[in-house]
Amino acid sequence: MTGIGDLFRSIAIYREWTFGGRTKARAPQPTDLPADFLLPDASNLALVLHELVQRSATRKKLIDYLKRFYAAAEQIATRIHGGTVQLFIDEGMDDFVPATRLSDGTLRYLSLLAILCHPTPPPIVCIEEPELGLHPDVLPTIAELLKDASLRTQLVVTTHSDALVSALSDIPEAIVVCEPSPDGTQLRRLDRESLAEWLDRYSLGEIWRMGEIGGTRW
């Protein structure tokens, strides 16, 4: 049973994405928290990003993706003082924006970067609705991050976003449709060949909205 317990403990699950004004992700964080991977409540976000930016390749990747969302960002910065670490975005010219002033969406995006750009993630990572709080035009970037991270870990992602699904039109087989039935929830993986003619004319999200792949409310 120890092996099974260790396996379950190695699964990273992100279900509650709350980044309001009093959340731990905004506040200075104790330096004795784990720094290897993001905790479910993102309470060690500053510590994880502090570790990741020490690696040149990962730092470049983080900044490149951050600039797609936050054009003014030059660097991800952290300050360690009095046993705590605080997160900032460096906009250049000594203009450091603390996590306490960042939008909910920016903190959510930084958390996704901390998860999806990590070079050595846990073996299984589960993320519920990564699109929440983000502008639809950034969802293709989220899809790109998901594809990249899936090369290093098994990702399980839930979504209600047709924009995010559309951004995965090139890999329809990655989508599993969940539907209720009298016998319980049914899971069905999409098949590229059966959708080929549809995908010649429409994105996967459009096909979903048309009701052609299931996963609808009716």
PLM region descriptions:
Residues 105-108, 135, 190:
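Gly/Ser/Thr-rich active-site loops/lids in small-molecule metabolic enzymes
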Residues 141-218:
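C-terminal lobe/lid and adjacent interdomain/linker elements of RecA-like ASCE P-loop ATPase modules
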Residues 132-136, 140:
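Conserved D-loop-proximal element of ABC-family nucleotide-binding domains
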Residues 128-129:
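Walker B catalytic acidic pair
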